[in-house]
Amino acid sequence: RGGILSLDNLQSEGDLVAALTPVYKELQTTYKNPHLVRTNTYGSDDITTWWGGNKAPLRVFDGFNYGNGENSDLAWLAHDWKGFWKVIYHANSLIEGVKTSTAPDAIKSVVDGEARFLRAYSYFHLVREHGNMPIVIDGMTPTGKEARATVLENYKQIESDLLLAEVSLPAPGSTANVGRASKS
């Protein structure tokens, strides 16, 4: 099961839990990028570039002017951009699938909460790096024509997802959920 399962196949508890795997896998793949940690510190005085050096593409970070969303093709940001959007679309698919699943309500609630947490987490990274972002919470295929929402609207969506997730996520310490989202 290397990708998101067909929505028709999300009928049992095992199907729903298995469908979480590609969402977490994409997040793991995104975090393997060595630049992710650095992009979160650029724009501060922690890391700067030297004008005479070979890091010209990184100068946008010194001026903190990369948040206009126009630099998503910058090599240092492209991996994060693509990876977090994949997490969002996988999470959207799972949230849609949970709605029609015949699995027990308790597991549906947990899986929905995890998917919403992962979507919120991804938006949190994207809005900090790119500013105004499209909010795509319906559908699983981007059109490329989604309008950008303001940073405030993005944070409201993040908060909404996190509040819904908080109700559904399990308490920390469950051995069945090691490495997965929980309430802490």
Regions from the PLM with identified roles:
Residues V178-S184:
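Amphipathic alpha-helical protein-interaction segments enriched in hydrophobic
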Residues R1-S44, T48-G52, L152:
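Acidic, glycine-rich segments characteristic of secretory precursors and extracytoplasmic regions
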